[in-house]
Regions:
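Charge-dense, helix-prone N-terminal extensions
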Residues: 1-58
């Protein structure tokens, strides 16, 4: 798991619970999308998008 995603999940219990409910394949896709980003701002955007989705905001 990317460090930025792990930190964001640790800081947000609702998103962390959403992460735990996800199937392994979905978790892997979120992690891959973040890891594959070349620019730091892209990684940050993808982490924010994943957290919002896990919170049920998108």
């Amino acid at each position: 798991m990317p460090a930025a995603l792990a930190a964001a999940l640790a800081a947000d219990p609702v998103a962390s619970a959403g992460w735990e409910r996800q199937a392994y394949s979905h978790r892997k896709e979120h992690a891959r999308a973040i890891t594959d980003a070349k620019a730091e701002d892209t990684r940050e955007r993808r982490v924010a998008k994943a957290i919002a989705m896990l919170r049920g905001e998108s």
